[in-house]
A protein has these predicted regions:
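Short, positively charged and aromatic/hydrophobic N-terminal segments
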Residues: 3, 10-20, 24
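Positively charged, polyanion-binding regions of nucleic-acid-associated proteins
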Residues: 28-56
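Short glycine-rich, basic-tinged beta-strand/loop micro-motifs
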Residues: 50-71, 124-137
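Charge-enriched amphipathic alpha-helical scaffolds
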Residues: 65-66, 71-94
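Charged low-complexity interaction tracts in eukaryotic proteins
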Residues: 88-118
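Negatively charged, low-complexity tracts enriched in Asp/Glu with abundant Ser/Thr
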Residues: 125-161
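A cross-family detector of function-defining hotspots
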Residues: 147-183
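Intrinsically disordered, low-complexity regulatory segments enriched in Ser/Thr/Pro
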Residues: 177-205
Length: 205
């Protein structure tokens, strides 16, 4: 069973402000942001299926500013516009809009199809979705899923109870290069659900 969390789609824009320091940094920034976009879209394509069309990501402006280390005098819209230009050859023309402090990034069908065709589904995500969608599974099977993957990748898994934010059990890997996300897994009478956050987003909750 899947539920969408409003913070889930927050895009990490960290380092984007460094575009002013030269082309190399700008390209590096574009790749970092592009990866977060493609990871999020690919995840939702696998979770809910994809039969064409556009997909939208929503996030609050303060999260973008925090991730960018931008102060109130720096232009968030200009930074986003520069990024859109950089990724246009792959993701198509992104449509960005804002209502007050809530931003929407719409990825066109061209970009969504590119992501579906070019971005492989991570092994961990495949394994986790199988566990989550299998009736009767519990947190113990989730724990085994992360532990098995950690052993295969020669790292360790960290598990914490997120009582403060009521996000269930939080799983992450000691080596972030294995997987840079935090997985918040909840178990109730309806089964298992999860939300995936970047580490920065989770720490900011």
């Amino acid at each position: 069973m899947f539920t969408q969390h409003p913070i889930h789609a927050i895009i990490i824009l960290y380092f984007l402000h460094m575009q002013h320091n030269g082309g190399d940094l700008e390209n590096m920034t574009a790749k970092l942001l592009e990866k977060h976009i493609t990871d999020t879209i690919r995840e939702w394509q696998v979770k809910i299926g994809y039969e064409g069309g556009t997909m939208k990501l929503y996030y609050p402006a303060e999260s973008l500013r925090r991730s960018l280390s931008l102060d109130e005098t720096e232009d968030l819209d200009a930074a986003l516009a520069a990024f859109c230009k950089e990724v246009q050859p792959r993701l198509g023309t992104l449509a960005i809009s804002a209502v007050k402090d809530r931003y929407c990034v719409e990825i066109p069908e061209e970009g969504c199809s590119y992501i579906e065709q070019k971005i492989p589904v991570p092994e961990l995500l495949q394994n986790l979705l199988l566990v989550i969608t299998t009736p009767g599974n519990t947190m113990e099977q989730v724990r085994d899923c992360f532990s098995s993957y950690a052993e295969k990748m020669h790292t360790t898994v960290e598990e914490n109870a997120s009582e403060e934010h009521e996000m269930g059990h939080v799983f992450s890997f000691s080596d972030p290069s294995v997987d840079e996300y935090c997985y918040c897994v909840e178990e109730n009478e309806f089964g298992l659900t999860y939300h995936r956050f970047s580490r920065e987003d989770y720490e900011a909750l």
